């Protein structure tokens, strides 16, 4: 009973939700054997024919290449490409490739020489003696990628599987209409396909190996059964024809009943899937030592006279293949690369064949029907019923059209396999797959930008952290340098510390005084007296310095004289502006005048008694003259403001004027007599004295005129004569001094 259950379990087939049954249209091309196509004159080999980054160029323009020679180096996930034939590299430039966008990609352009010479080939017939790593590296360096349509590097896929793969599935379903490349390959090369499957099994060491094939390929099924007749490690599973049973997730569920988790991979559940064409390419790479330079391509459609499957070299222009098959284009002819549901229309026919090219469909105008105009969605939910991934295409359509990327991601748009079943059943002829492709591309671009922004932020934060560390290190170095004293400073610091400790020790010692004795403070008193004497000496020195500076500086003397004159003028103004009721006492004024005369006589006597060698300071004389003028003006104002009844005697004034003139003459004579011959008279002093004499003369004249009583009039003639005499004497004194100076 247990064996019966195991046998039932072994051959059980599961069914997935959704799916459609379109016309197969496979009989147009699967009835004729594989054939070779003549070499083209020029080959265009894009550097990127797989998922991932392009390899590094290892050829240059003008190089001679052989078939199978690497054109790029494959490092990491970068898959190399190889020359499809022998010839010369004529250009390395961007060229439009087999892509829905028809964007230009960097390509190597080779002109064939027609000889089609191979590089030396080193096959590993005894591959079982090789290690797993060696086999994976050989598969990778020979450019083997998934030929079912995805183009994922096979070596990377095998490396990622590791030791956790329990089931190896070979996808031979080929469910899309018109395409028969795998069907024809299994019919003509079944033994080589099985040998490639065994190499994959040797690398992965799975518990079971399953080949899934649809029941609409009877010849291929019979050929595989014939090859597997004596094999018990490989199981051939025939499944019902249903589109898209060839999808990776759908075929995995059909054969194992396991579902690939959302956002995960089939390896997460212990399953790894490879295409029939990939298994054949692995056999040629490992056993025959031939890199992938060609693949099987289906040429079909009513616009082709000789449909079938051909061995097409990679890089062959599509136009060359179609012309070899008898292509008869119509006015609005279109050519589809791939099937009618998952393929795309080529913008022009000079694009090259690449590793993922499995079919070239050239339908007639009536074969696919007239293109229908897109209409509004009627919410019929037919797309949701047909979706094999259990998605909601209607909602995804609205989210994609409205640029609602977050909601589209939430509704698992990434799980869409772009099979086209929803668009096939849509009564409004909405190209849903195109909307979904565009939305996924935009989401991928947004995530790529976010990734770059995150990387830039991480780099910025790392840089900021590095700068902060460097700043902290600099501050620490500066701090250490500031704390550590120089060698010569250490001794001074040590000496200062020693003195402080000594003082502290002395301070802590108790003062002991014996009974009956007085403390000896003589040292303290002597120190205090010394400090006082030093302070007094400094003060005396400072005073001497200031006096010397005062005597030596003529500018300071001139400033002091100017200050004295300013004060005198201010005093005159105050007295002139005094109130009328505040009268100056004439007696007090007379006393002040007598004091001034006494000071003048005293000054004359001092000058007369001065030693001959003593020189009169001209600055001091100028200051004294200014003071005398100020006092004279003050006295004159006081006399003018005196009461009318107290009038000054004009005779007395005349006597005083005469006395003043006599004193002036006497002073001039003394100065001339006491001056040494070599000593020159200061012209400034002479001018000051002359001015004093003139001022006194004018003062006396004014006093006499203002204060004389009406009945006692002074003879004006006499006053004029006296003034003239005074002026003549002043001029004479000035001239005499000038002569003495000369």
Curated annotation (Swiss-Prot):
PROSITE patterns in the record: 4FE4S_FER_1 (PS00198), 4FE4S_FER_2 (PS51379)
Cofactor: [4Fe-4S] cluster
The keyword GTP-binding belongs to this UniProt entry's keyword annotation: no
Cofactor note: Binds 2 [4Fe-4S] clusters per subunit.
Region (Disordered): 602-719
Domain 4Fe-4S ferredoxin-type: 369-397, 407-436
Keywords from the named record: 4Fe-4S, Cell inner membrane, Cell membrane, Electron transport, Iron, Iron-sulfur, Membrane, Metal-binding, Repeat, Translocase, Transport
Localization terms from the record: Cell inner membrane
Membrane topology value: Peripheral membrane protein
Protein family per UniProt: Belongs to the 4Fe4S bacterial-type ferredoxin family. RnfC subfamily.
Protein name: Ion-translocating oxidoreductase complex subunit C
Gene: rsxC
